[in-house]
């Protein structure tokens, strides 16, 4: 590996499964300590146990759409690891419908998890990031920190039937570009990775086991129609869905020193697919 993240500490939200778990695995393999967060405490423990060095991993379960939880995640990370260098805002889910069938609650839920949650987490981390940077610069050191927000080609291109999801994923791009300009003076790279269709429970067949979730009293169906999956594969230049490991590779680039002079950008990791 052409770089090491030894001595760095990361937060990865939505890391109980799928892409989030794969991101955490990449970061730990590169030498970082990682705080995992997810709604599902059982899946969090599974993630921790699956990593190569669980001694450098801690977990904090909690619903990030609770206004108090993002700050708790940041504080737990600082209390455990005494530093914070990398934040990956990965948590999310899809609750889909066309606009005329989308309730205010459904639309707001998509904004809350995909836009408001990253905002709150980054706001909670801002004091530590700024003070650490000021101390480092006063000593003549440049220490780069990293923020990676997860978006989607639904946010960059729009996608019929995903009015809430697409809006939240588009909004986080604006957050990314604005924070890149606000935090550049503190040596923070703020970028986004936009995924196409990756092999997670969000794109499994509708009738597959586990193709649903419970959220705030609602039973939410996940996945897509099998015929649509075939259509998407045919439209994708690479002819297949991506794997969580491939998705995590794109995120790792933005977490690494290889991206030290890249900020405010959106990297699409979708096999060439656009809606």
Residue ranges and their predicted role:
Residues 2-4, 157, 234, 250-253, ...:
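Short C-terminal tail/terminal secondary-structure segment
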Residues 98-99, 103-111, 232:
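Substrate-binding pocket helix/loop in short-chain dehydrogenase/reductase
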């Amino acid at each position: 590996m052409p770089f090491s993240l030894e001595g760095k500490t990361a937060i990865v939200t939505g890391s109980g499964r799928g892409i989030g778990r794969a991101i955490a695995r990449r970061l730990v393999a590169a030498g970082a300590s990682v705080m995992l967060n997810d709604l599902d405490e059982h899946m969090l423990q599974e993630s921790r146990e699956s990593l190569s060095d669980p001694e450098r991993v801690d977990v904090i379960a909690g619903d990030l759409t609770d206004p108090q939880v993002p700050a708790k995640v940041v504080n737990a990370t600082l209390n455990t690891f005494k530093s914070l260098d990398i934040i990956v805002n990965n948590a999310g889910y899809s609750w889909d419908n066309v606009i005329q069938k989308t309730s205010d609650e459904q639309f707001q839920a998509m904004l809350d998890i995909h836009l408001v949650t990253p905002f709150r987490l980054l706001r909670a981390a801002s004091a530590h990031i700024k003070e650490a940077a000021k101390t480092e610069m006063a000593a003549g050191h440049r220490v780069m920190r990293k923020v990676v927000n997860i978006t989607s080609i639904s946010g960059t291109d729009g996608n019929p039937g995903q009015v809430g999801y697409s809006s939240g994923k588009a909004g986080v791009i604006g957050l990314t570009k604005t924070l890149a300009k606000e935090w550049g003076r503190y040596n923070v790279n703020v970028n986004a990775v936009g995924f196409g269709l990756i092999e997670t429970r969000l794109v499994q067949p509708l009738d597959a086991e586990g193709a649903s979730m419970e959220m705030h009293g609602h039973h939410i169906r996940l996945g897509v129609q099998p015929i649509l999956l075939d259509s998407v594969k045919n439209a994708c230049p690479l002819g297949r869905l991506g794997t969580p490991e491939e998705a995590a590779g794109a995120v790792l680039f933005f977490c690494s020193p290889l991206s030290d002079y890249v900020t405010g950008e959106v990297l699409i990791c979708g096999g060439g697919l656009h809606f």
